[in-house]
Structures are given as structure tokens and as C-alpha cells.
Amino acid sequence: MNFPHFALLALTTISVSLSASAADVAHWPLDTYKAERWSLPHGQVESVPGAKGGGLKLDGASVIELQESAPLANESFTVSLWFNPYDLSGGQQILAGKNRYSRGERQWSLTIEPDGKLKAHLWQKGWVTIPCPHSLNPGAWHWTVLSVSKDRATLYLNGQAVGETPLKSPISHTDSPITLGGIWDAGHVRQAFTGAVDDCLIHPFARSPEEIAKGYEPSAVAHDLPKPTPPVPLWDASQILPAAEALPQVEGATFHVLKARRPDNDGCRWTLGVGLEWHKGKLYASYGFNTGEENTPSEEAHVRVSEDGGKTWGKPLVMDAGEGDLGVSHGVFLSHKGSLWAFMGAFHGHFKGTTHTRAYRLDEQTQRWSPLGTVLTDGFWPMQQPQKMADGNWIMAGLHVSSGPENGSNPPTVAISKGDDLTKWEQVIIPTAPNLGTNIWGESTVIVQGKRILNISRYGTKPLALLSVSEDFGRTWSPASASNMPMTTSKPYAGTLSTGQKYLVCTNTSNTGGARSPLTIAVSKPGASLFSKVFRIRSSEFRGTPGVSAPKVDFSYPYAVEHDGMLYVGYTHKSHAANELAIIPVKSLLIAP
């Protein structure tokens, strides 16, 4: 009998000791559980037949936290885990790990990679990895072991060593607990695993190859795989979606620095969410700015202005720095009837439960921003410039940040204005398909086609675009469902070009999973409903930019606006705290009808 439970499971150990004796092994059988062994509900787990007795099934939105595990698995150790993968196309999935990225705590991870193979990751002031050459079998139990000494790490699959790497220094200790099925970080499940886990052990020393080989006994238990729900079409299935290295480079694009990378002279530690708008011959850009950590009260909304089409930028101006525990962050612009409006995401204190949207209008004489107060509450964060609909109202795409328990999903949403009154909006939260689970972070964008509105949104940690459709000017929506278009785990930005082509800026390739590189733009044929070609805007290492060029670059939260035959695309290098601009000739995106 199956027993579904909501959980960030905190499972107590059978035996935990901090001495280096062989008898002092931390063991989590994961056969069953009792209510008093839980804490911090998140996601859903279910009892299933395990490799050894019972096991726990995770739904792709759950994570298991091992109680009292923070002191374990440092320097010399061995971690072993039975796992049964259900979906090998879900991007990078954590089987086990000891990391909290937002706190700078990184030690090690065991993952299933986008290619469906096992890999170990070890922190050495940067990740070093041990890839496994063997494919995994969905529905079957596998046993993985990571054996680590002070100067070497070895990865095993089903009792056999599959790779190793030298370590320049021992794996350092952090306060992060060990988690299974994902990483629990800043209130979110990251790199979630879909499948089942069983029998996790942590030895306080590096086990020998002979011990590990002797400890493996194959499991004949197999699981029936969940029947996949047919994806909704967003990509033209008659066309092959290329791998990143096979994408055509968009022609004629130029690149400019909007905000220089860290360390800059402004003390910035974090920036995100470029917004763009042309207004009276000038190009305005906004972004979130923080000398501290993301989503904290020290967040500010900054603005810069270019008078030469984005080639150079004036000094940054503070639109709103907030007061007390108020943080004001990134948002969107709208130039309307001679006025420049801004709608910015904001929050009090700890972000969740207080998210709202504030409106501002530019005073043309003083070049200062006049605050107009809160115009949307209940968790609305703006993600796309408002667009006028044929019924006379404006529609603004966004994210609904849940104010309930932390296991609540954060679905895509839109706001609809009261005609031309841009201070009065109604939020319409988009329902989500039941099979998506709760691990959703629905940063969304819309394409307006008369009364028909398409909403494309980020899934969460799964690298796949969600799609929802309204046939009544955004008043009601089909449930947001998984589409047939891979997309990285970042905010997308979409629209319709003057050529009649739909476009989508994000990272859309067949092989990059949740990586935010390269930066791409997908387009349709003129008047067509499906995307059918993807261009590369730029790659991580790129000689054509005056800005960041590095082996690992994360192109985050793009934004786009068309003007005089050019598409202006803003984006953030989140890990480098830099904002940049690509200017693309619209004619270079044209494909034959």
C-alpha cells in the first residue's frame, strides 16, 4: 500500500557518530517513516518497493534532508545510495548532495546529467567532476558510491569503479546538511530528481574498491514508469531543434556593456532583470541592484539612460532604494501617452509572503521617478512590459510568488488593467496541470494575438517551457502544461516582431538542459504559430563582446524591445554581476514562410 506524504523529510539516522571508526556508519534505510521524523513540509514522497525492502519515491518536487548530517561527509568519506530513475530527460538531477548555493556552501554532489548518465561533482574552489560512461536504465535500481580521501575521489556504479579524479585539497566542511533527490536552498528545491531512492550510508573514511565490489548485490525489483503526458506544441515538430554547438550565429549583432562586471566601483554583489524601453529618443534600462544578497531589503531599483542607442550609458540613478525592510528590485517599463512608466517588483523582509508591484512615473524635468504606490499585491512580480489588447485593456505577464506554505507552487500569472488607468490592475493566476507537481517557478511572458493570448513560462528546475492559452483576453486560461520545447531554467521573454514572426529569447537547445548558455532567440515563420528556428545570440566565450567572456557564463532574465528595425536584448550575467545589451537587426531573423 502506498502512503503519499508532503515532506521536506528529515529522517533520523540509525547510527551516527563523528569518530573515524569503521563501526560508526550513518545509515538511513529509507524503508519507511513515521510522522514524528518529519520537518519542514515540501513536496510529496510515496512508499514503493525498494532495492532492499522498501524505498521512497520522489515526484520531482521533493527533497529528503538527512537529519544530523551536517557534520558528515567531509575530507575522507564514502557515500552510497540506491536510486531508480524515472525520467532521464529532466535536466541535471541531484541524487545526493551537500550544498547550499545561496550561502556559498558547496562540497559535493552525485547527479544524473542531461545526457542521462551519472556524474560526481566535488568542490575545489570550482567544481571538478567524474563522469560515468555508462547509460542508466529508467525503472531499474542502480547503486552508486562516491569514495573520497584527502587527495582522490572515485565514483562507482553497481560495484565497479567508473572514474576518478585527484583532489588538490580535502573537501572542506560546511554547515549544509546532506540532501537526497535535490538541493534545498533558500526555500526552493533545486535540481530535483524524479524517481526513487533507498538505503543511504555515509562511512567516515574512504572505502576500498574491494569492499565496494563485495557490497554490491543486484536488485531485480523494477518499477513501472509513469505514463508521460503528451506535451503541448510550442516547437514545430517537423524541424530538428539543434544542439548548442550546431546553432547558427545571428548575423550583424553588436554588443555593449550596460553595467560592468563585479568587482565594479559601486559595491554591487548582485544584479538581475534588465528592463528596456525607448522613450523620446532615449533608451532606458533598469535592473535590480544589491550590495548584499538577492531578495534582501538592501535591494534597489536602478536606471541608466543611453542617448546613442545603447552604445554608452549615463550614470546610474536610483529609482527607489526602499526604506526599512522594503526592498525594491527589477521590473518593466512602458512608454505611453508621452509618459514613461515603470512597474517594479518589491517585497518586505524575507521576500515570500510580501511580494508586490509598485508603479513609478518619470518626471521629465527633474529626471526623478515619482512613486505612485503599490498597484498589485498578493505575490505579483512583473516580468514583461504591459501590452495593449484589442479590448482596450493592458496585459502584463509575471510570476505569482506563493504566500502560503513553502510547498505551494509559484505559478505563472498575468495582470490586466482597468482600461488606460495604469494604477489599477487585476491579477489572474494561471492554473497548472496536476502532473507538473509543485516545484514551479512560473516567471512568464505573453504573446498577444487578438483575444488569444499565449503564456510561456519557466517550469522550475526542469528545463522545459510551460504553455498556457487564453481565448478571452487573459480572463481564463488553460492549465499551464509542459510543452515540447526545451528551455533553460530562467525567465523567458517573447513577443511578435514587425515581420510577423513570434520570438522567444532564452536558452533553447536540444542538449544544454538547465544551463543558461548560450543565449538564444527562437523565431517562427511570419504569421506561424510554432517556433521553427533558433539562432545563437552569443556563447559564453565570445570575442565579439566588450563585456564578460568566460568558460562559464549564465545568461539570465533576458528582456527585449524592437525599435527602428533593431531588436534590443538586455540580459544579466548573474554569476558575474554584470548587465549587457545585444542589438540585433530584425532582418537577420527572417526565415522563409
Give the ranges of each region predicted by the language model.
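Sec/Tat signal peptide C-region and signal peptidase I cleavage site
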Residues: 18-22
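Positively charged n-region of N-terminal signal peptides that target proteins for export
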Residues: 1-6
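Beta-rich carbohydrate-recognition and catalytic domains
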Residues: 217, 221-269, 278-326, 335-489, ...
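Hydrophobic core residues within well-ordered beta-strands of beta-rich domains
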Residues: 24, 77, 142, 196, ...
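Extracellular glycan-associated modules
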Residues: 23-227
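Structural signal for glycine-centered tight turns and loop->strand junctions in beta-sheet-rich domains
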Residues: 34, 62, 114-118, 151-152, ...
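Bacterial N-terminal signal peptides
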Residues: 7-17
